[in-house]
Every structure is written in structure tokens, then in C-alpha cells.
């Protein structure tokens, strides 16, 4: 094991999923595990599903200053990553699962999250046409949000291929409750969530500027996106339905073949056979993205549906995928595209 990693924010859902993946990585040794609110607690008290970490104890994030780890993962709440990153040596690679360094426009950051913008890092979505070389050459990588991951992987090929109009994109995406983190809030209690679907932050969700940023780069111009997130009664998973007004000549075959060609050879993206639509359960526990697309002649819109595990490809799995690229390791090391069923 030639690579040592440290994790800040290791007690949350994203941090716990990252630890599970790191334990299975053939080249990685797990170093310091920081979690300010859980400092001093045994790791297995917080994550009883990780018995191989028996005997390990969470430290305070301040203990990471001057770390000799090869890479540090920041799995902290939004707005907290920048302060920890500033204490780390420039020689240490850092992958930030939070939002602090995703956005290029400081004003967009202030509108979405409040406070001062901490600067922009390389955007870590390897399947984007321009991304792999940028990630591999970077020491600081911002891991995308879960909704932007699912949405971008559906719409980017259609924008690059000129199949949809950039000015008319609509996304409705449902997410499980773990996307909101581990903090206890009334609206996330089981008795509140079970048997219920509800839209939230309609027109104001903090991920919309991130979605717009990525899709605009793909289109080569500023896009317009309507984004409606939906809270679903399941622990994890995202199902995103993304549509765009089709350009002349676009049909169902063109949409499908564009997606298939864009992701040919990708280890984690599966364009499903025609007529088979993505299920969130099929991606559970993996780093997979399941994709299907078609064209609706009644409305003249191209439609793409994507499913991911929001804690996998939407967070920890993607972070490890980027870390592998940053460290010069096989991109798929410690990861799987296989899900867990039922």
C-alpha cells in the first residue's frame, strides 16, 4: 500500500461511504480521520458497518495541518472546506466533496451559498469531454454535486452534439434523503418522508448555478436551465429527467446514438438498451451512471433519464475516481459499476 489518505468530515454520510470504498482499495492506506463534532469517538460507533476500522478514533480537523498524507479528502459541510484546505501543504493533493471550490463566478457563489468565494478548483467529473487530463494534472479538485453529476451526464452529450437548444433546458430530479446530510431535521424524519414526495427549493436550489456552469461550457454559450428538485422517500439515489427543445433533424435514434457514442468505453456509464429505463436501485452502492434517452415528437423535446447513487457517483465514488486520476492509479481502482439488489 503505497498511498496514504486522510479524510476530514469522516463522520457524515459522504465520509462514511468514502471510508467504505477506501477500505477496498488495493493501493491505499487510511491515515487520519477527522470529524470535529465526533472527535474522540470510535469510528465504529458512528459507522458500525465498517468493522475493519475497529480501534480507530476520530480526531479534530486541526490535526490535519502539516499532514504527510498523499491526498486529503474534504467531506465537510458547504462553506467549511476552504479553511481546512488553507492549512494543508501545497504538496498535498486535495479532493473537496463540498461546494466551496466548484463555481467559477464569485457572485454566483454568493447568491447560492452566501459568504465569500474561496476560489475555483479543477472540476472533477471525469466523463466530461475535457475533464480527465485536467483532473490528472491537478493537486486541487472540486468534486461535483450529486444533482449536477446526474444532470450533466445526461445533457452534455446532447449539447456538444447540437441536438438541443441551449436556451430551453428543463430538469426535474428526485433524490433520497441522504443528500441532505446527517444532521437531524424535522422534514427528514422517517415519519415525515415515508409515503411522501415533495418538491423543495424550487427555482432557488444551490446546485442550479453549478449545472448551468457545466452545461454552458459544453454548449459553448450560456444556457438557461429550469431545475426542480424533489425529495423522495428513500435513503439514497437520484433519478434525473432532463429535457431540451430539440434542434431540427433530431429524432429518438439520434438521441440514443449520441449518448451511446459519448459513453462508449466508459467504465462507469451504462447507456441502457433501447426501451429500458434507469432505476435508482440498480446503481445502489456503485459508482455507476445508468442513462437512457429518446425524443418526444409531440413536444419536440429530447429526453434523457439518468440514475446514480448520490453517495456513490454523486459523492464518494466520484471523489475516489478523481483521486485515482490525480495519483496516477488505475481510474477504476477500488470502485465498481455493479449495484446491490434487491
UniProtKB/Swiss-Prot annotation:
CDD domains: AGPR_1_actinobacAGPR_like, AGPR_1_C. PROSITE patterns: ARGC. Its EC number is 1.2.1.38. GO terms for biological process: L-arginine biosynthetic process. It comes from the Bacteria. Signal peptide: none annotated. Keywords: Amino-acid biosynthesis, Arginine biosynthesis, Cytoplasm, NADP, Oxidoreductase. The active site is at residue 146. Pathway: Amino-acid biosynthesis; L-arginine biosynthesis; N(2)-acetyl-L-ornithine from L-glutamate: step 3/4. The keyword Transcription does not apply. Pfam families: Semialdhyde_dh, Semialdhyde_dhC_1. InterPro entries: AGPR_AS (IPR023013), AGPR_type-1 (IPR000706), NAD(P)-bd_dom_sf (IPR036291), NAGSA_dehydrogenase (IPR050085), Semialdehyde_DH_NAD-bd (IPR000534). GO terms for molecular function: N-acetyl-gamma-glutamyl-phosphate reductase activity; NAD binding; NADP+ binding. GO terms for cellular component: cytoplasm. It is found in: Cytoplasm. Its main location: cytoplasm. The keyword Oxidoreductase applies. It catalyses: N-acetyl-L-glutamate 5-semialdehyde + phosphate + NADP(+) = N-acetyl-L-glutamyl 5-phosphate + NADPH + H(+). Belongs to the NAGSA dehydrogenase family. Type 1 subfamily. Catalyzes the NADPH-dependent reduction of N-acetyl-5-glutamyl phosphate to yield N-acetyl-L-glutamate 5-semialdehyde. HAMAP family: ArgC_type1 (MF_00150). This is N-acetyl-gamma-glutamyl-phosphate reductase. The lineage of its organism: Bacteria, Bacillati, Actinomycetota, Actinomycetes, Frankiales.
